[in-house]
Amino acid sequence: MLNRRNFLAAAGGLALGLGTAPVFGFPQSRRKRLAVVTTSWRYRTHAWHMAERFLAGYPLRGKWHKPAIDVVSAYVDQRPDDDLSPGRAKEFGFTVYPTVAEALRCGGDKIDVDAVLLIGEHGNYPLNEFGQKQYPRYQLFSQIVDVFRKDGRTTPVFNDKHLSWKFEWAKEMVDTSKEMGFPMLAGSSLPVTWRMPSVEMPYEAEIEEALVVAYGSTDIYDFHALETLQCMMERRAGGETGVRAIQALKGEAVWAAMDAPEGSKAGWSRRLFEACLSRSQTLAQGESFSHRYPTPEEMREWVKEPIAYRIEYVDGTRATMLLMNGLVTDFTFAAKLKSQTEPLSTMFYLPPNPNVTYSAALMENAEKMFMTGKAPYPVQRTLLTSGMVEAALQSLAGGQQRRLTPRLGVSYQTARESTFWRR
């Protein structure tokens, strides 16, 4: 059957020798097979962002890269009238199955794929009392693992965004992958997208304080902002130690904390805040202004409901995440290091629709894991950020009180080498 995938594979193999060339340094005797398990496959959903990178390829360092793994099956939990999966299946020659198990077994009686792409984002699911959308990532993961157990074989699993809205389930997912011995990767595109400037947190840096300024809603964009923070913080001296306490603030409480004296534990560093705004490419301006630093009065006028998450790490390091809708529409980071007088600061660059190339940066890392059997960075990062979101939303719902988080004592070491895109 001649379809788009077969044409691309043949053309790519002729042009680049993909049939015999090593992929990420590992020679392949045959092309690997990928199952997509997703909640929704509609325009601008995460399946559209990410799964389709394995159908049509993606730009990689100035070339169009065709992954050496084929989507051979899919399970789509919710399929409204604008579901794209039937059309994509016809175009690229894969099958959409009615259950997760059938997708992993490709309609047979044994697992018949080499990797699983789990995307539990978008779709119509209920909210809990803390404002968390109850995406069935844990339930879908459990169905995947059930096939692994029954068939006596595992594969790498990539999980998009949070592991779960419930920390106990998120931890169980990570523990299960470790117990069964399969590689697992998860999280946001923010840690692996381009940065402006292209800087990395020095490995084993002594961080005194850090700040992320971002935008968007809680339970969605706060996760991306926390992943932005965590990919830098985990490189500090001693490695990641986990989070001891979190306090979420909103409205006037945020402005009061921002007015606290410099160096006070009641707020955060104005110098870091200025560094973040100075890196932003979307800083709001008054009518007829070109590019001016906003006054406190302007910020209060433009940002109707600021949100702050104040984070205390087990080792005593402090960090803050700010959602400042109306002031910025990007993600910036700044940190005070013992080794330098000026803050280390950067913007995490997100290319716009329709190409949203930052998702290709994430899928390149997923592809590396699928091909090599080794996760490029620790899944524990996303275990921690998943728990941070839950704790912060519980703090917001509980009167903005500081919450001790003994469950979030997630310690781990990340690799020295960077994984974000530079060119």
Predicted regions and their residues:
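N-terminal secretory signal peptides
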Residues: 1-2
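N-terminal glycine-/serine-/threonine-rich beta1-alpha1-beta2 phosphate-ribose binding loop
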Residues: 12, 24-155, 165-172, 178-179, ...
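An acidic- and aromatic-residue-enriched active-site/binding cleft used to recognize and process polar
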Residues: 34, 121, 162, 187-190, ...
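A contiguous, mid-protein "functional segment" used to position or interact
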Residues: 386-404
